[in-house]
């Protein structure tokens, strides 16, 4: 059975255009230009010419133009304008939350379709070719991969059949990172946050050809974060920044921090547009609200004269999603680090 997608749903087009218009005025990189090219060298040894040149994204707009564009999008969508601050080094105005942009869409309204089509729009209009989709769990990763598969023909018809590779980051195939960096076609990598958030991850380990991360960051990828409220710990935010993103586009129905909010489709909006059949509110507090912290103290025990150990039950995040588990903690332990999520 062949699935058909409606390419003309206005609310989805509005969400896509919101992200695209932030970069209005950006010159399109043509087929003879590789955009950002960075020569990769490790421990003083330069790689072969083919492997050494990272064909990456490049942004030519000034901070003033980005601020102007962002405020124009927000005004169009009746949202609060982003705060502006002064960069301490350049002494120029910049967006207070940097190049993080949020799109809020009610569950079930096609969020994944929107950001996959946004990839094609950014490629079509600006020539950007390197994209990384960061997800919080394997389950969501597999869902994104399936969406890439079933929409491929649909997007090929809309966007003149661009040559595109998409794949899941596999730590056993470190050559993927070099392929991502040096390939001059549209590249989409899907990766779980826990695959690169720790120093021990293969992504961050040195090899004879350098770290896989070094290849990726040389491209200044557009990073798309699915369910960013699950990635608000300092460790996870630092991991995303380590990718050296050109920008970070954040998609969720329940943002914890909607940095530079560009578009909002609330549950009421979705109901009014007949996108959902009804809205139900069972309780002010959800029984299983995994966006909130959960800590249950099970037992306290004393070790020696002064040391106290607590046995606590928490919701911890790993590459398989949220798992409820029991951990031992002492005074001063960082629960955010232990659980992999904001507490």
Task: Show the residue positions of the predicted features.
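RecA-like P-loop NTPase motor core of helicase/translocase proteins
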Residues: 1-343
């Amino acid at each position: 059975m062949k699935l058909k997608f409606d390419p003309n749903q206005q609310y989805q087009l509005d969400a896509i255009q919101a992200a695209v218009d932030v970069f209005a005025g950006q010159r399109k990189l043509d087929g003879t230009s590789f955009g950002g090219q960075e020569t990769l060298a490790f421990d003083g040894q330069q790689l072969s010419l083919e492997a050494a040149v990272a064909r990456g994204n490049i942004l030519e707009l000034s901070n003033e133009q980005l601020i102007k564009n962002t405020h124009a999008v927000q005004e169009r969508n009746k949202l609060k304008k982003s705060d502006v601050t002064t960069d301490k080094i350049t002494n120029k105005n910049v967006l207070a939350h940097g190049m993080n942009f949020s799109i809020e869409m009610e569950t079930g309204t096609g969020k994944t379709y929107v950001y996959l089509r946004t990839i094609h729009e950014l490629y079509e209009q600006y020539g950007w070719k390197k994209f990384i989709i960061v997800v919080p769990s394997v389950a969501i990763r597999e869902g994104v991969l399936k969406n890439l598969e079933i929409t491929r023909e649909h997007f090929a018809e809309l966007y003149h059949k661009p040559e595109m590779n998409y794949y899941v980051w596999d730590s056993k195939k470190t050559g993927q990172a070099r392929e991502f960096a040096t390939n001059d076609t549209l590249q989409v990598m899907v990766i779980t946050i826990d695959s690169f958030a720790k120093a021990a991850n293969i992504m961050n380990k040195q090899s004879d050809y350098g770290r896989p991360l070094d290849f990726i960051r040389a491209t200044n990828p557009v990073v798309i974060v699915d369910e960013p409220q699950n990635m608000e710990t300092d460790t996870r935010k630092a991991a995303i920044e380590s990718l050296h993103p050109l920008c970070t586009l954040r998609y969720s129905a329940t943002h914890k921090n909607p940095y530079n909010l560009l578009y909002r489709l609330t549950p009421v909006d979705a109901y009014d547009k007949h996108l959902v059949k009804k809205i139900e509110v069972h309780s002010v507090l959800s029984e299983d609200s995994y966006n909130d912290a959960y800590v249950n103290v099970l037992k306290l025990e004393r070790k020696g004269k002064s040391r106290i150990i607590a046995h606590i039950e928490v919701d911890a995040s790993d590459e398989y999603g949220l798992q409820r588990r029991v951990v031992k903690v002492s005074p001063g332990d960082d629960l955010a680090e232990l659980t992999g999520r904001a507490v």
